[in-house]
Amino acid sequence: MAETVEVLVPGGRATAGPPIGPALGPLGINVKAVVDDINKKTAEFNGMQVPVKIEVDDKKNVTISVGIPPTTALVMKEVGIEKGSAEPNSIIVGDLPIEAAVRIARMKLDDMLSYELKTAVKEVIGTCVSVGVTVDGKKPKEILAAISAGQYDSVLEA
């Protein structure tokens, strides 16, 4: 019977310890080879938590699927911070250009609840609120209103 293991690992730095080792060890496969493969596939997401799905079939063949990091991790990497604000409504820790928000939305579009780029960008900007990041030097809620009013349509269509 095929087994599927879903884990969140640091990009490019997964280890044979928890959560991967204990999940794969009983399946009788080479955990080190799997970890090395995961590290190669997640190297571009260095410093971010990356969702990884490991499927092991009856013949012990391993298939590794790498997801896209959470929106929060992408926003923080783009801004260059390691942690979000402890008090996001009063302490601002960085600024995200609207173009970067659009880029993140395009990356995450398949995983989001949104069907359109405009609403996906709004989701990314909503994440900025909870992390304590401004967008184009303004409060995220001001940008959300401007997007709804159509002021950023040219950026969204580019």
Curated annotation (Swiss-Prot):
Matching SMART domains: RL11 (SM00649)
Keywords: Ribonucleoprotein, Ribosomal protein, RNA-binding, rRNA-binding
GO CC aspect terms: large ribosomal subunit
UniProt keyword annotation of Repeat present: no
Similarity comment: family membership: Belongs to the universal ribosomal protein uL11 family.
Binding partners and assembly: Part of the ribosomal stalk of the 50S ribosomal subunit. Interacts with L10 and the large rRNA to form the base of the stalk. L10 forms an elongated spine to which L12 dimers bind in a sequential fashion forming a multimeric L10(L12)X complex.
Protein name: Large ribosomal subunit protein uL11
